[in-house]
Amino acid sequence: MQGSVTEFLKPRLVDIEQVSSTHAKVTLEPLERGFGHTLGNALRRILLSSMPGCAVTEVEIDGVLHEYSTKEGVQEDILEILLNLKGLAVRVQGKDEVILTLNKSGIGPVTAADIIHDGDVEIVKPQHLICHLTDENASISMRIKVQRGRGYVPASARIHTEEDERPIGRLLVDACYSPVERIAYNVEAARVEQRTDLDKLVIEMETNGTIDPEEAIRRAATILAEQLEAFVDLRDVRQPEVKEEKPEFDPILLRPVDDLELTVRSANCLKAEAIHYIGDLVQRTEVELLKTPNLGKKSLTEIKDVLASRGLSLGMRLENWPPASIADE
């Protein structure tokens, strides 16, 4: 076997043994030592928890208010009926949610074949048992909501979010969206030329019939590859820190002197000296203001007190005053 000692072997799909339409064995080899468990466990977890599918999520049965009741003429109690509906295998094309109906009367079993649906829905196992009617006059009618989802979502996880709008008699069902019912993998020894320390991965799985086992493994591998893409092109994706530009001047300095609500005498004196903004005022000294005509010590004291209440004072130095926004006016 030629190649670098650091070069990894690439596995190939050796065999697909179709035991039945819902049961298959898939064999991959050769794998580097340890990679049988690495890939087998990853694929197993994805197949059990992350495969999309359709499942019954809500049921309404005529004359039934809650799941802890029974229905006259029906052999099973409501909990058992819900459990049977939970195992219903449905394939839906092009929709995320459909409503199915079932109406049956007379003695005999009620199966998935009795469900009324449109052309977008396929009942994979029509013989799936739902309940038994035990009386000629007995009947059962129900509305079944089927939704598309992923993994497993218990009814308890949806109770709080739907409680306010869910009417009495609408029964929630644990939603098992995953089409994979059972999966196991086994790692066996494999050999390539002189190497005898390699792995062979054998995956055995059963589905509910809504997906072909080979297609299920293909989807699981695609999900795994997509999740690992970020690591292939690993780089620092941290966003550069955006520094907020601090204003050059305190906004209060850009406000007009009128906002200080000075007396009319003091305000007129400042305007006569072309002091229009608070920034203009704080740069003046007491001596400069006292030289202003008609502005005495009383007005000066008023100005100082008003500025102090805003954390300002006379005689302040402001670099680059006035700002462009004021200078252009």
UniProtKB/Swiss-Prot annotation:
GO cellular component annotations of the record: cytoplasm; DNA-directed RNA polymerase complex
Keywords of this entry: DNA-directed RNA polymerase, Nucleotidyltransferase, Transcription, Transferase
Catalytic activity of the protein: RNA(n) + a ribonucleoside 5'-triphosphate = RNA(n+1) + diphosphate
InterPro entries in the record: DNA-dir_RNA_pol_insert, DNA-dir_RNA_pol_RpoA/D/Rpb3, DNA-dir_RpoA, RBP11-like, RNAP_asu_C, RNApol_insert_sf
Region spans: Alpha N-terminal domain (alpha-NTD): 1-235
Quaternary state and interactors: Homodimer. The RNAP catalytic core consists of 2 alpha, 1 beta, 1 beta' and 1 omega subunit. When a sigma factor is associated with the core the holoenzyme is formed, which can initiate transcription.
Free-text domain note: The N-terminal domain is essential for RNAP assembly and basal transcription, whereas the C-terminal domain is involved in interaction with transcriptional regulators and with upstream promoter elements.
Full protein name: DNA-directed RNA polymerase subunit alpha
The species this protein was found in: Pectobacterium atrosepticum (strain SCRI 1043 / ATCC BAA-672) (Erwinia carotovora subsp. atroseptica)
Gene: rpoA
